[in-house]
Amino acid sequence: MNIIRKLKPGTISLVLGPMFAGKTTFLIHCIYMLERLEKKVVFIKSTKNTRDKTIKTHSGIQLRPKQCKIIESTQLSDVGSLTDIHAVVIDEAHFFDDLIKCRTWADEEKIIILAGLNASFEQKMFPSIVRIFPYCSWVKYIGRTCMKCNRHNACFNVRKNADKTLILAGGSELYVTCCNNCLKKYIY
């Protein structure tokens, strides 16, 4: 299936999944396709994302965009004018409390692509994802295999330490993604 047909001006697309599932890799693929179509793309990442100052996945895949502008921000409302931009790509969308700002950009006929976690380490939806969900014309779920048993589909993010902070950026040093069976062993 050619994803580019789903990415139309004025629409919001949402990619959800657990950690380490390939959501950022999917965004990189979308950026490459949009750049091949000579679209001006802006990639927005949260300042809470401590991975790198570039577009980089947990597995180390890095995008070297031709013309894609990278913006780091704590809030989408601080991004400023995007008048000359065709597409807005947002990684770790759950980090942004004002994700609903994407509706304004969609009303301006921009292609909006969001990627975020399906749930927190407490297995609860992020409020900003819940608020933007009804406005998404296309939703994709990317799964992965359980990091504990390597047998079942994993959809749960589990924090390895006792920190209860809702947003705590990190990788495999802080989190594991597991299936329902392994989640029961972790929590109970």
Curated annotation (Swiss-Prot):
Its EC number is 2.7.1.21. Zn(2+) binds at C146, C149, C179, C182. Keywords: ATP-binding, DNA synthesis, Kinase, Metal-binding, Nucleotide-binding, Transferase, Virulence, Zinc. GO terms for molecular function: ATP binding; metal ion binding; thymidine kinase activity. Gene3D superfamilies: 3.30.60.20, P-loop containing nucleotide triphosphate hydrolases. It comes from the Viruses. It catalyses: thymidine + ATP = dTMP + ADP + H(+). Substrate binds at F121, L166, I167, L168, A169, G170. ATP binds at G17, P18, M19, F20, A21, G22, K23, T24. InterPro entries: P-loop_NTPase, Thymidine_kinase, Thymidine_kinase_CS. One of its GO terms (biological process) is thymidine metabolic process. The active site is at E92. Phosphorylates thymidine. ASFV replicates in the cytoplasm of infected cells and contains genes encoding a number of enzymes needed for DNA synthesis, including thymidine kinase. Important for growth in swine macrophages in vitro and is a virus virulence factor in swine. Belongs to the thymidine kinase family. This is Thymidine kinase. It comes from African swine fever virus (isolate Tick/South Africa/Pretoriuskop Pr4/1996) (ASFV).
